Amino acid sequence: MINSLRVIRAMINKEKTDILRNKKMLIIMFIFPVIYLFITFAGIQEFKGDGSAFVLMHSIMVPIQIIASIVAEEKEKGTFKMLMMSGVRAFEYIIGIMVIVMMFLVFGMVIFDQTGATKNSDTFEAVIVNMIAFILSMMIGFIIGVISDNQVSVGAVSLPVTLIIFFMPIV
């Protein structure tokens, strides 16, 4: 148990440095909060009000894209095999990545909350629903990352999946 916690903490630190070093990941993680922040402060009336569409995109699209990119990048570089051969178990790897990505996603949700995008919902209920959405989206991202051959193909695989998730309620 103690060894697992140590491995998970090491995975969190590794992923934190990888994410902070990769500007593309940071842009993807904060694109929707920043766009909503810009719209709010620019005073664009057409988009003012409820930011639920931005919150939805942040809760579904971002975790899928980020997790799939992380897994595909580590497969491509050979880091994934090295981690597995060094004794990192699958659940330690998954939890380590999910925790650090969840922290960044929650920070994005704080930006949404402070700018008023979530003003029409109960805060506790919104947090629970977003956490569930984050976890489910990250699991889908893990599957896409494992299926994808490399980091470039992640977008081609994740886009149809994301569109199906978004348009499923309409059908």
Feature map (PLM): residue ranges:
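Alpha-helical transmembrane segments of integral membrane proteins
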Residues: 9, 24-28, 48-56, 92, ...
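Hydrophobic alpha-helical transmembrane segments of multi-pass membrane transport/permease proteins
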Residues: 18-66, 102, 106-107, 157-169
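Hydrophobic alpha-helical transmembrane segments of multi-pass membrane transport proteins
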Residues: 48-112
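Alpha-helical transmembrane segments and their short interhelical loops
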Residues: 90, 98-155, 169
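Residue-level signature of the cytosolic catalytic core of signaling kinases
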Residues: 1-4, 47, 60, 119-120
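Short amphipathic alpha-helical coupling elements at transmembrane boundaries
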Residues: 10-18, 81-85, 149
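Aromatic- and glycine-rich beta-strand/loop motifs that create alpha-glucan
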Residues: 1-29
